[in-house]
Amino acid sequence: MPWFPVKKVRKQMKLLLLLLLLTCAAWLTYVHRSLVRPGRALRQRLGYGRDGEKLTGVTDSRGVRVPSSTQRSEDSSESHEEEQAPEGRGPNMLFPGGPRKPPPLNLTHQTPPWREEFKGQVNLHVFEDWCGGAVGHLRRNLHFPLFPHTRTTVTKLAVSPKWKNYGLRIFGFIHPARDGDIQFSVASDDNSEFWLSLDESPAAAQLVAFVGKTGSEWTAPGEFTKFSSQVSKPRRLMASRRYYFELLHKQDDKGSDHVEVGWRAFLPGLKFEIIDSAHISLYTDESSLKMDHVAHVPQSPASHIGGFPPQGEPSADMLHPDPRDTFFLTPRMEPLSLENVLEPCAYAPTYILKDFPIARYQGLQFVYLSFIYPNDHTRLTHMETDNKCFYRESPLYLERFGFYKYMKMDKEEGEEDEEEEVQRRAFLFLNPDDFLDEEDEQDLLDSLEPTDASVQQSHRTPTPAASTGTTASPTPPTTSPLDEQTLRHSRALNWAPRPLPLFLGRAPPPRTVEKSPSKVYVTRVRPGQRASPRALRDSPWPPFPGVFLRPKPLPRVQLRVPPHPPRTQGYRTSGPKVTELKPPVRAQTSQGGREGQLHGQGLMVPTVDLNSSVETQPVTSFLSLSQVSRPQLPGEGEEGEEDGAPGDEATSEDSEEEEEPAAGRPLGRWREDAINWQRTFSVGAMDFELLRSDWNDLRCNVSGNLQLPEAEAVDVVAQYMERLNAKHGGRFSLLRIVNVEKRRDSARGSRFLLELELQERGGSRQRLSEYVFLRLPGARVGDEDGESPEPPPAASIHPDSRPELCRPLHLAWRQDVMVHFIVPVKNQARWVVQFLADMTALHVHTGDSYFNIILVDFESEDMDVERALRAAQLPRYQYLKRTGNFERSAGLQTGVDAVEDPSSIVFLCDLHIHFPPNILDSIRKHCVEGKLAFAPVVMRLGCGSSPWDPHGYWEVNGFGLFGIYKSDFDRVGGMNTEEFRDQWGGEDWELLDRVLQAGLEVERLRLRHFYHHYHSKRGMWATRSRKGARAQRS
């Protein structure tokens, strides 16, 4: 190409390369900005650890997962739009076939139109009756963030409802007063988070300040600098723009609830000021919207739906996978393949109460439980820390002694026999004959007034000969005035002469004494009467015979005194004081021995010196036996140290705090308990399930289904498989036993529900789910209707008189029967929406279309229930409207009356239920027309608990969730609508009585993943609050 300027290009090569480089840089900059603008950053998140393991998130000490958007909140340039919650179980993940990956977040990018009249207030959403103190606990709420309990507004960012167990979501726009760098700070009790967007879009909100993550952090009102996380970095804001913000707050049941947001210009010395109405505005006006309208509710990285619960080891055993949860999806065997496998037999158990009169509400006593194999892990083992009723032990006994009685400690060399150990550790039992009778007790009451000392001395004071056992004059010695005053307020106790110590432990070696006195005087003394140290040294305190074999220090006692003690002689009374023990006064005796010194003297007890005057009447107190002992005298710290034993180291439960010895005082004689780290023990295998029976235990609400022994289940399955292969020539092989349920009848036999996974030769896996009856030898029952008489017993039992399986007549369940869920509702918008969403998910993930939803609406004002039913993707639904107050019995009866097919199942349901994926299959299996009704046990979730972290108890007393055929429901008379009207509670028990009297069995089982949501009861009974609020309630 002669026209191409090759020489010029060669000369300007460097300029051309620079131009090319600048062009590439400009193009890359344009591409980067175009991708970053909608929130898709090019850089890769550092989501992998050192060893290549993926980091799923951060979990705090309480198990609350910290959202990934808050882990790097300081990086304001990072977009949070594509951040997703960790993989796990979402609301639909309990259903088989659900999505394995979380759906993308539907964050709000477009804001609704804003008007000038929005200024001066912001939106406030309240989530009531939800426990926990962390914002993560609020995000666990089933209705967060779209369906709050209350929608209202607030005029400044400082809220204190003076309530407990709630969560707040405050959102709107902030209007800065001037351009510049602004710092924000949040303070609250308990945790809170403040999110701020760089513009008016909720999708761009970033966490800028927060108080705690675990729920234990809090601040005082206006304390903006307690935590470093409270204060944000400076943010460049412009007065001409508005910025979306969001404030999340969680309050538990303690403390002074408050949450406030302050701001200040980024200048030295300025303090934070509350953001008031002049600088805030509404996000949107919700006053005219019903509670089921949620399209306007903003979803931001702080508050959005679609996040899954945190991953981790399940806290409950019931959350682990079980074949029962998905076995209903396996194709069922054709009924023709099971005909004539077992011979038919009549089924009429002896526990049927047909036409048997029972008292009101006594049907609970005639409901029996079924045995399950294999273990379905419905026992709430994670709740047994607080409730140990499963072990059939007294809670007080377990708290005091634990489970040591099930352990046999191994003996060591030189250790005494176990029986001697028991005797050595026995408690002191006093002889009742040695205590005072009623007359003596009356004398004791009279002794509170000054009486003649000689009378009391003649009754209660032993002679020296009696107390010492030596030959002396029978005349009592003269006593000092101090002894007379002491004896006036004395009480004699005749101790039983037992050599056992009072406290547990090794008994100290006996001491050589001449003879123990038969009575001990416990006296009250006046303050100011104290013996000299010399008298104490010369007269040591003798131990009580048979009670204490060595001295024990008396703990300091705090006595209860009147709040306003009387004043005497102008002296000022002082408050209660803890006084020290006063040593005993040496009495005048005619004996010089140690034992003779006990006569005529009393035990000094600690008193409270209310006045400084001696004339003031003393405040006295009777002490327990463990406190009646000699105080440790000075200089006796090391005396008798070698005589001690572990049993002497036990102290009173009231004296938990030990006094530190003063300088120069010798340490006490008490030694630390010895710990034997090498102690071993023997124990046998304990099966506490053997202690349970099929009686409906109404006292223990954490125990699971009864466990069927494996040998019994395997034996029944082996008999059935033998008969099945005998008919089909070995065409089926057993893969596994999925479920076996047994209802016991000790007189005629047991009913079994067998659910087996079989493999057909050359075919696919199939599901066998049939009722069989294990008839006892010699048991013969005629059919109720006279149809299909039972063959004689000789032809139906084995020669060795073994029980044999047979097919119970009229006890076959239908797989394609229609199930009608009947739910009465009123002003429960958020729960109606959740119920319809759960039913839609049940239809989508199971593919089962044989169910119908019947909602009976009592003039709900917070939503259009009929419109919500039409919008839901349900196979069938019916909307029934009633007027007046809410009546559960009338609502249920109205729903049943709307069912036309008598051979369909009606399930009397509640609105706040979380259903397991196999709920339809469970209802059909346990409802047989004319024979069986089904009352599954639901687990009531506690406050702040969710289906993915269930904490609660089984509702063993409730029968409100009830499945029964329409024909049987009509035959028993339906609901009692006359007696149970405005209130509910008891209508389920009354229905149960009539169902049992009609001759039906009621199957009672605890279902896995079957929960009753914890919900607020405020507003459910149309109650009025003392002070109305401008709010919409759901």
UniProtKB/Swiss-Prot annotation:
In terms of PROSITE patterns, this protein maps to:
PA14
Could you list the residue ranges that cross the membrane?
Answer: 13-31
Which spans does this entry mark as compositional bias, Acidic residues?
A: 636-661
Locate the compositionally biased regions of type Basic and acidic residues. Answer: 72-83
Any one Gene Ontology MF annotation carried by this entry is: glucuronosyl-N-acetylgalactosaminyl-proteoglycan 4-beta-N-acetylgalactosaminyltransferase activity
Q: Which UniProt keywords apply?
A: Glycoprotein, Golgi apparatus, Membrane, Signal-anchor, Transferase, Transmembrane, Transmembrane helix
EC code: 2.4.1.244
Q: Which InterPro entries match?
A: Chond_GalNAc, CS_glycosyltransferase, Nucleotide-diphossugar_trans, PA14/GLEYA, PA14_dom
Q: What does this protein do?
A: Transfers N-acetylgalactosamine (GalNAc) from UDP-GalNAc to N-acetylglucosamine-beta-benzyl with a beta-1,4-linkage to form N,N'-diacetyllactosediamine, GalNAc-beta-1,4-GlcNAc structures in N-linked glycans and probably O-linked glycans.
| UniProt protein name | N-acetyl-beta-glucosaminyl-glycoprotein 4-beta-N-acetylgalactosaminyltransferase 1
